[in-house]
Amino acid sequence: MTDPAVERDAAEAASAFSHPPVEPDTTAAYGEHPDQVIDFYAPRAAGPGPAPLVVVLHGGAWRAPYDRHHITPFADFLARQGFAVANVEYRRGSSFPHQQAEGPIAGRWPETFDDVAAALDALPALVPTALPGIDPRRMVVTGHSAGGHLALWAAARHVLPAAAPWRLPAPPPLRGVVALAPIAHFREAESRDVCGGASAQLLGGPAHFELRLPYADPAALLPTGIATTLVQGRDDIVVPPEVAEAYVDAAAQAGEMVGLTLLDGVGHFPLIDPAADACAVVSEEIAQLAW
């Protein structure tokens, strides 16, 4: 007998991935590797002033088969709501036998983190040419699933351990973060085998998990002092809502209030599906921080 939850998830994924990729207005490199690029989408609608910048970090369990192209319809959707959009690519995991994974492993340590840090650091120089007339001071970072993790991490670089090469001396210039079904709490995610143990793979395998956790787990990098909202489907079977709830609890224990919007009858993929009502909720959450 087919599990109804699995059937629903498959239908939601099929809808989210049914949209053709949307070509960007321009693309710029932030490094020499082919994956070190950012696609830029100019706002398609006028807002009350210069358009805010939304940085998008795609999901896919940090694994190589899943790149930024699957989230371009979402980037275009945001542009049609009046946002300027920067869709970031970054290096992901391929096949590394020493990590004892079947198929592509999740992430590359430290390259995945190198790239996200480098991309965010490069934006102030790239945006004036790629998106003239927008307001980079009103910048919000969003990301889905594994990209939600990276969005939270990018906003927490100023609280990384002193030895971290990505540490910033001050908070990044962000209006806030909107993380969508994020892998936000690595211990909780691993306890539920989220994406086949992807969090441990991202850190280089079980042998490195504990040592690298303070450098990579958003739940260990609190408080950030940056406005943060998580949007989560209650019926998500890919990244269950308990992962987001564990992050919110960790933030509260650190003295920080984090917003959590739980959507009834919603799974993992409608959050980035322009045809889904949940996507409009995401846009509104971003707008509340950006404008």
Regions found by a protein language model. Give the residues of each.
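Short, surface-exposed "cap/lid" segments of acyl-processing enzymes
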Residues: R44-F77
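Mobile cap/lid helix-loop segments that gate and shape the active-site cleft of serine hydrolases
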Residues: S15-F17, E23, P182, R187-A220
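Primarily recognizes the serine-hydrolase "nucleophile elbow" in alpha/beta-hydrolase
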Residues: D121-R192
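C-terminal catalytic histidine-bearing segment of alpha/beta-hydrolase fold enzymes
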Residues: H98, V231, E242-W291
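Short beta-strand/loop motif that positions the catalytic acidic residue
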Residues: L230-Q232, D236
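Structural cue for short, hydrophobic secondary-structure segments
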Residues: V56-G59, N87, L230
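Catalytic nucleophile-loop/oxyanion-hole region of alpha/beta-hydrolase
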Residues: P65-A75, A86-P136
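N-terminal cap/lid segment of alpha/beta-hydrolase-fold proteins
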Residues: T2-G47
